[in-house]
């Protein structure tokens, strides 16, 4: 079911629903997908709804309600072939990650326009995805985290203070992560990026820098967002 204003995506309802099901499955399978901006925005709505239903199914003690929620989830996914274990992954791995988060499980980041037709592209990803897998390999996704760490590396290389906006964004990331986990993920990303940039990786130095960075991130003196003025100004009648 589509609630509110939705993009038709140049398809009839059946083809549109099939497309969004496929995109949602790919997102839950790989934690990150690239598509046109419009498709990413619509797939984000579907994915958010599925995660909300899964959280409710996990936390409810009513077996009837749980069965209904599972049926709703299954109706929004293709559960054949490579996706046959997707329900298990949703309930055991993805939804538990967001039990303390009230919403905002996905993120859409704009990319450069597509080369062949200049269509606006974006990346759709699950927030708070682990950077490293259990086998200690780098996971796909979490583009925002990589961009933030790259900004930190550039600041350190140029001996500049960290950008307040970078600290604010890292503060948001840290809200639902343990400090030790965040420290480890930043160190891993630094190691990979410094190698790609052909820069030396001094573990002791980077560890010291990361600890100092996290002190800034968790500091209560972080700059607060300024409230944007309303576009309408109310004035009394003459």
UniProtKB/Swiss-Prot annotation:
GO CC terms of this entry:
mitochondrial inner membrane; mitochondrial large ribosomal subunit; mitochondrion
Any GO molecular function: structural constituent of ribosome
**SUPFAM superfamilies on file:** Prokaryotic ribosomal protein L17
Give the UniProt record's GO annotations in the biological process aspect. Answer: mitochondrial translation
Q: Keywords on this record?
A: Mitochondrion, Ribonucleoprotein, Ribosomal protein
Compartment list = Mitochondrion
Q: How does it assemble?
A: Component of the mitochondrial large ribosomal subunit (mt-LSU). Mature yeast 74S mitochondrial ribosomes consist of a small (37S) and a large (54S) subunit. The 37S small subunit contains a 15S ribosomal RNA (15S mt-rRNA) and 34 different proteins. The 54S large subunit contains a 21S rRNA (21S mt-rRNA) and 46 different proteins.
Q: What does this protein do?
A: Component of the mitochondrial ribosome (mitoribosome), a dedicated translation machinery responsible for the synthesis of mitochondrial genome-encoded proteins, including at least some of the essential transmembrane subunits of the mitochondrial respiratory chain. The mitoribosomes are attached to the mitochondrial inner membrane and translation products are cotranslationally integrated into the membrane.
Member of which family?
Belongs to the bacterial ribosomal protein bL17 family.
- What other facts are recorded? Although this protein has evidently no mitochondrial targeting pre-sequence, it is efficiently transported into mitochondria. Present with 3000 molecules/cell in log phase SD medium.
- UniProt protein name: Large ribosomal subunit protein bL17m
What organism is recorded for this protein? Saccharomyces cerevisiae (strain ATCC 204508 / S288c) (Baker's yeast)
Q: What is the lineage of its organism?
A: Eukaryota, Fungi, Dikarya, Ascomycota, Saccharomycotina
Q: Which gene encodes it?
A: MRPL8
């Amino acid at each position: 079911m589509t609630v509110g204003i939705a993009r038709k995506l140049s398809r009839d309802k059946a083809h549109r629903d099939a497309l969004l099901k496929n995109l949602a499955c790919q997102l839950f399978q790989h934690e990150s997908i690239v598509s046109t901006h419009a498709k990413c925005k619509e797939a984000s709505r579907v994915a958010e709804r599925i995660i909300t239903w899964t959280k409710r199914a996990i936390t409810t003690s009513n077996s009837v309600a749980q069965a209904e929620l599972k049926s709703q989830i299954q109706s929004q996914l293709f559960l054949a072939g490579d996706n046959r274990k997707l329900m298990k992954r949703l309930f055991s791995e993805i939804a538990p990650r967001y039990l303390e988060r009230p919403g905002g499980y996905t993120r859409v980041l704009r990319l450069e326009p597509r080369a062949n037709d200049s269509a606006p592209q974006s990346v759709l990803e699950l927030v708070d995805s682990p950077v490293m897998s259990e086998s200690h390999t780098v996971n796909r996704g979490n583009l925002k985290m990589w961009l933030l760490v790259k900004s930190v590396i550039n600041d350190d290389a140029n001996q500049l203070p960290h950008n307040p906006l970078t600290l604010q964004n890292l503060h948001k990331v840290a809200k639902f992560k343990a400090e030790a986990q965040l420290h480890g993920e930043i160190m891993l990303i630094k190691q990979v990026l410094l190698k790609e940039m052909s820069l030396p990786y001094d573990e002791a130095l980077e560890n010291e820098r990361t600890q100092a960075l996290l002190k800034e991130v968790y500091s209560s003196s972080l700059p607060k967002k300024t409230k944007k003025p309303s576009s309408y100004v109310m004035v009394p009648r003459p």
